[in-house]
């Protein structure tokens, strides 16, 4: 199989490199999406012995309103058949429930807003999958369709941002160690998304026009509020302004996140002007959602944050202040900051300029240029 788009964007490898790659077995995680499909093809073109693996991480109910695992598996199988590679199948639903989903629920109960995709990468894709591929399938490497790159300095692997700035997924992979990065290949991290689609169309792959998945992996396209209500009982309460004025009611604190504007159900409040309301605090003790008016309200701003559950890609704790940039949510512009270590497990992060909607439970991920240093979970804001 050939792709002119591939040949345009990937220079041919030397005979020596091809010969070396042919000795290596790569298990490519096949999600049934276009990124993993093209990743498998790129690896084939680079000479590797490629096999696919489809992971089922969630036991579904009877809801058929979103893209099911069965449909994704069919797409993954169709791509593997087209490429002429074997597809393995594995069920990690028990591991997912124990190591990802239960933590997700606990965080929501505690009033925080977790990011299960980060935990899924840590516990499933780069732990359970990596271990299974190496130990049971004899893999030299695993590969995924993530938009990140591998770098190397002084013989140590580094995690780099994906070439496509709009699709870079290093934010979700900051928990990887340098050793996990060394065992992983990220073929589409070297190109931009439109090129990935063009390669898939050149090859006539079943996933060429399949839209990108959105939402949390185990919820799919369903309404988040309806899904969460099945597992956590909601506790309705008051919505108050910072000054204490009652302006509405909420269905449950867990349905709201800091900085949220839409979906609060607050109409025009007499004597309070037309500026929209934003969530600035979740008062768990009193079950009150605290709001303030105006996107530039000082109550929305933080001068920094405290983070814990730290993961550094090189696995070396930070002992001295470090200048870098940080993202406190995906696709955010880089924020210049200084990391100030409190101890090996906790850091203070001071922003150069105040930032809005710094959300406990989300991750703060740090960069120096293209290099992802690692990150941690936001514990509190610093006002």
From Swiss-Prot:
<comment type="similarity">
    <text>Belongs to the MnmA/TRMU family.</text>
</comment>
<feature type="site" description="Interaction with tRNA">
    <location>
        <position position="362"/>
    </location>
</feature>
<dbReference type="InterPro" id="IPR046884">
    <property type="entry name" value="MnmA-like_central"/>
</dbReference>
<feature type="region of interest" description="Interaction with target base in tRNA">
    <location>
        <begin position="115"/>
        <end position="117"/>
    </location>
</feature>
<keyword id="KW-0963">Cytoplasm</keyword>
<dbReference type="Pfam" id="PF03054">
    <property type="entry name" value="tRNA_Me_trans"/>
</dbReference>
<feature type="active site" description="Cysteine persulfide intermediate">
    <location>
        <position position="217"/>
    </location>
</feature>
<dbReference type="InterPro" id="IPR023382">
    <property type="entry name" value="MnmA-like_central_sf"/>
</dbReference>
<dbReference type="Pfam" id="PF20258">
    <property type="entry name" value="tRNA_Me_trans_C"/>
</dbReference>
<keyword id="KW-0547">Nucleotide-binding</keyword>
<dbReference type="GO" id="GO:0005524">
    <property type="term" value="F:ATP binding"/>
</dbReference>
<keyword id="KW-0694">RNA-binding</keyword>
<feature type="site" description="Interaction with tRNA">
    <location>
        <position position="146"/>
    </location>
</feature>
<comment type="function">
    <text>Catalyzes the 2-thiolation of uridine at the wobble position (U34) of tRNA, leading to the formation of s(2)U34.</text>
</comment>
<feature type="binding site">
    <location>
        <begin position="29"/>
        <end position="36"/>
    </location>
    <ligand>
        <name>ATP</name>
    </ligand>
</feature>
<feature type="region of interest" description="Interaction with tRNA">
    <location>
        <begin position="167"/>
        <end position="169"/>
    </location>
</feature>
<keyword id="KW-1015">Disulfide bond</keyword>
<keyword id="KW-0808">Transferase</keyword>
<protein>
    <recommendedName>
        <fullName>tRNA-specific 2-thiouridylase MnmA</fullName>
        <ecNumber>2.8.1.13</ecNumber>
    </recommendedName>
</protein>
<feature type="binding site">
    <location>
        <position position="55"/>
    </location>
    <ligand>
        <name>ATP</name>
    </ligand>
</feature>
<feature type="active site" description="Nucleophile">
    <location>
        <position position="120"/>
    </location>
</feature>
<dbReference type="InterPro" id="IPR004506">
    <property type="entry name" value="MnmA-like"/>
</dbReference>
<keyword id="KW-0820">tRNA-binding</keyword>
<keyword id="KW-0067">ATP-binding</keyword>
<feature type="region of interest" description="Interaction with tRNA">
    <location>
        <begin position="329"/>
        <end position="330"/>
    </location>
</feature>
<dbReference type="GO" id="GO:0002143">
    <property type="term" value="P:tRNA wobble position uridine thiolation"/>
</dbReference>
<dbReference type="InterPro" id="IPR014729">
    <property type="entry name" value="Rossmann-like_a/b/a_fold"/>
</dbReference>
<feature type="binding site">
    <location>
        <position position="145"/>
    </location>
    <ligand>
        <name>ATP</name>
    </ligand>
</feature>
<dbReference type="Pfam" id="PF20259">
    <property type="entry name" value="tRNA_Me_trans_M"/>
</dbReference>
<dbReference type="InterPro" id="IPR046885">
    <property type="entry name" value="MnmA-like_C"/>
</dbReference>
<dbReference type="GO" id="GO:0000049">
    <property type="term" value="F:tRNA binding"/>
</dbReference>
<dbReference type="GO" id="GO:0005737">
    <property type="term" value="C:cytoplasm"/>
</dbReference>
<dbReference type="GO" id="GO:0103016">
    <property type="term" value="F:tRNA-uridine 2-sulfurtransferase activity"/>
</dbReference>
<keyword id="KW-0819">tRNA processing</keyword>
<feature type="disulfide bond" description="Alternate">
    <location>
        <begin position="120"/>
        <end position="217"/>
    </location>
</feature>
């Amino acid at each position: 199989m050939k792709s002119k788009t591939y040949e345009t964007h990937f220079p041919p490898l030397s005979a020596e490199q091809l010969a070396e790659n042919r000795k290596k077995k790569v298990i490519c995680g096949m999600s049934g999406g276009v990124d993993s499909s093209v990743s498998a093809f790129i690896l084939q073109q680079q000479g590797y012995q490629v096999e696919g693996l489809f992971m089922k991480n969630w036991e579904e109910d009877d809801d058929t309103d979103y893209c099911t695992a069965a449909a994704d598996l069919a797409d993954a199988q169709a791509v593997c058949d087209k490429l002429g590679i074997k597809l393995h199948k594995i069920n990690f639903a028990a591991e997912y429930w124990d190591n990802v989903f239960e933590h997700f629920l606990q965080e929501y109960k505690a009033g925080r807003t977790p990011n299960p995709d980060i935990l899924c990468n840590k516990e499933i894709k780069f732990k359970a999958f990596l271990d299974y591929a190496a130990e049971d399938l004899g893999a030299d490497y695993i590969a995924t369709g993530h938009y990140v790159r591998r770098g190397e300095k002084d013989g140590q692997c580094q995690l780099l941002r994906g070439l496509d700035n709009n699709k870079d997924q290093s934010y979700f992979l900051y928990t990887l160690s340098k050793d996990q990065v060394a065992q992983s290949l990220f073929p589409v991290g070297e190109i931009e998304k439109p090129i990935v689609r063009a390669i898939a169309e050149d090859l006539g792959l079943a996933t060429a026009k399949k839209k990108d998945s959105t939402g949390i992996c185990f919820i799919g396209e369903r309404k988040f509020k309806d899904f969460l209500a099945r597992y956590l009982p909601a506790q309705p309460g008051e919505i108050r302004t910072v000054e204490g004025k009652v302006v509405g009611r909420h269905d449950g604190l867990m349905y709201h996140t800091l900085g949220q504007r839409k979906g609060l159900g607050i109409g025009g409040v007499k004597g309070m002007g037309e500026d929209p309301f934003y969530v600035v605090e979740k008062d768990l003790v009193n079950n009150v959602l605290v709001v303030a008016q105006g996107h530039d309200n000082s109550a929305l701003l933080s001068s920094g944050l405290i983070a814990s559950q730290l993961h550094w890609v090189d696995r070396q704790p930070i002992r001295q202040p470090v200048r870098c940039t940080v993202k406190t949510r995906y696709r955010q512009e880089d924020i210049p900051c200084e990391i100030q270590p409190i101890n090996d497990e906790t850091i203070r992060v001071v922003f150069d300029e105040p930032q809005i909607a710094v959300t406990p439970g989300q991750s703060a991920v740090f960069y120096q240029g293209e290099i992802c240093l690692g990150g941690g979970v936001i514990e509190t804001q610093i006002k």
